[in-house]
Every structure is written in structure tokens, then in C-alpha cells.
């Protein structure tokens, strides 16, 4: 469910989310949530459009859920970053003027960053040849972007296959590679607030951190500066490679990253079976005081919930407050909510990001 884009209605919509989060966390004695609002427009750093033919031309288009044959033509997109809005008409003019760029083009994706970087992906229902690459190189130079062409089984990269983001957390600027096609937080301004909240919530520690679902290291980098050591897990190869690059780029050297699922990590910690991917890592050498989780919308499964129970402190970022409440219900006999927050990553929708710090009773 989404509401119409209406900045004048933003404050009321945000208050409704705050009320909903309070209702969900009230049974657990949660304190009042800290509330982190979003810019009212130009907050979304990525956008994806299908192309729709009308009057002999291809136009940016989106579709309402369940109405894939009824296109909504898009000329501008006020929730997207100013950079995306500046690129949209220039890219459209380029494909309208070039058969090489327009032939069988069906989708366009934009990824921008607060640091000013931009990457455009153009998707085709045909093989890409040398003539396309010549035209695309010229276009990338004119637009000042990295440009990626995709067709079935093939990807042509002009420039880089990632965008660079820079985020300030407690006065330190962290640099992030954001690979094409990988998950990134869409609302950069709110992401920066979220990182700062997590940094403050974990505090200065002299013990170790276990992080599940670390992605490209979005939280890993700042949180690693607050603890002695970090063991981080992630199963996506693309995200693992990006996280390793980000750790190196930022000279963060107290993190070990392993490709294990939460289930496999539980088996390893319980010494059920050894894992070759843990070769050279002595799990018994870690003194874990905190576990950090940022699970998908389904939340943590019951076994992962039980894994987190063994830790003194659970720092939990959630993109679905309903499953967050379910997980807290499973943990409430051993842990209580010490602090909580709402991050308005997705204005004009019912979606909300939230965070809680749970501590052992």
C-alpha cells in the first residue's frame, strides 16, 4: 500500500507510523521510540523503470500492483534523487536519437549516491554488439556516469560496476562500494541516521560483535570501530566481495567475514559440525557481548532467534515491525527492550524501518 506523493501530508503519515510501532512494542514495555524522519522529496537514491511504447516512442513507465498491462507514464519522479531526475530526460533524449541505444531496450535502472556518484543500467531483449558499445561509451561520457548494458547472459560495463557512497558516522566518513544489482539502502539520508543510531546504541565495548546478514558492510564498518573484534556472516557472494572491498578501503582490520547462513553458524557455534569456510577462525577466541541482526522482511526464523538469545545484547534493525514484534515475543522472557527507534526509509508508504536494543534481564 502506498499513499500519493504529498509532502504536506508527510507529518501526519509519519505520526501514524510512530503510533503503529508503539502499539506493536507496547506489550514488551518498550520506551518511547526515537523518530528519524526523511527528506520530503528527492530521498530515493535508486529507481527502476520499465519502458512503454506509445506514439512510436519509448517512455519511462511504472505499473500499479496487479495491473501489468496498464502503464503509468513517468516524466519526472520527485521521490527520486535530484541526480536521477536530471539524468532521466537526458537519457531518454539519447535513446530517442539513437537506434543502437533504443533497439529492444525494455528497462532502465538508476543508482545514485549522496556522494554524487551515478550508475545507469540499460536492459535489452537482444545481444549487445560493438556498435552499441560505441554509442554507450559516448553516452556515459556525456552523462558523467558508469553505464552497464545487460542482455540475456551478458553484461557490458563502461566505467565501474559499482557506485561509491560516503557516509558520515560520528565524525568519521566511511566509503562504500555499492555493486550493480546488489541490495543497498534506498534512502541515503535516513540510512546515515540509522547508522548513527546503531553506533550510539552499541556504545564503546571491550568485547566482540557477531553480525548476521552483513550485506556490503553497511553497518559493519562503523560498528567495528566500537568493539574489539567482529565476526560477520553473509551468504551472497556479491555482497561478500563488496564488504571485503569496503573493509579494505576503510582500513577496518578487526573484522572476519565468512559465507555462512545463520543455521550453519549455529551449528558451528554448537560444534555440531566443522566448516571449511571457518578454517583459520577460532570461534572460542571470541568474547561475544552483542549480536547484530538486520534480517529480511520475514524476520528471524525461530532457530536464529534462539541463537541470538545466548547473547547479552541484541541489536536488531528491522524492515518489518510485525515480524520484529514476533521475534521479540520469542525473546521477551530473557531480554527486555532498552531503546528503540523508527527510521522513515519509505515515506508515503506504510513500510517502516525500526531498531531495538535488547538486553538480558
Swiss-Prot record:
Pfam families: tRNA_U5-meth_tr. One of its GO terms (biological process) is tRNA methylation. Keywords: Methyltransferase, S-adenosyl-L-methionine, Transferase, tRNA processing. It catalyses: uridine(54) in tRNA + S-adenosyl-L-methionine = 5-methyluridine(54) in tRNA + S-adenosyl-L-homocysteine + H(+); uridine(341) in tmRNA + S-adenosyl-L-methionine = 5-methyluridine(341) in tmRNA + S-adenosyl-L-homocysteine + H(+). The active site is at 319 (nucleophile), 353 (proton acceptor). GO terms for molecular function: rRNA binding; tRNA (uracil(54)-C5)-methyltransferase activity, S-adenosyl methionine-dependent; tRNA binding. S-adenosyl-L-methionine binds at residues 185, 213, 218, 234, 294. GO terms for cellular component: cytosol. SUPFAM superfamilies: S-adenosyl-L-methionine-dependent methyltransferases. InterPro entries: MeTrfase_TrmA_AS, MeTrfase_TrmA_CS, SAM-dependent_MTases_sf, TrmA_MeTrfase, U5_MeTrfase_fam. CDD domains: AdoMet_MTases. Dual-specificity methyltransferase that catalyzes the formation of 5-methyluridine at position 54 (m5U54) in all tRNAs, and that of position 341 (m5U341) in tmRNA (transfer-mRNA). Belongs to the class I-like SAM-binding methyltransferase superfamily. RNA M5U methyltransferase family. TrmA subfamily. This is tRNA/tmRNA (uracil-C(5))-methyltransferase.
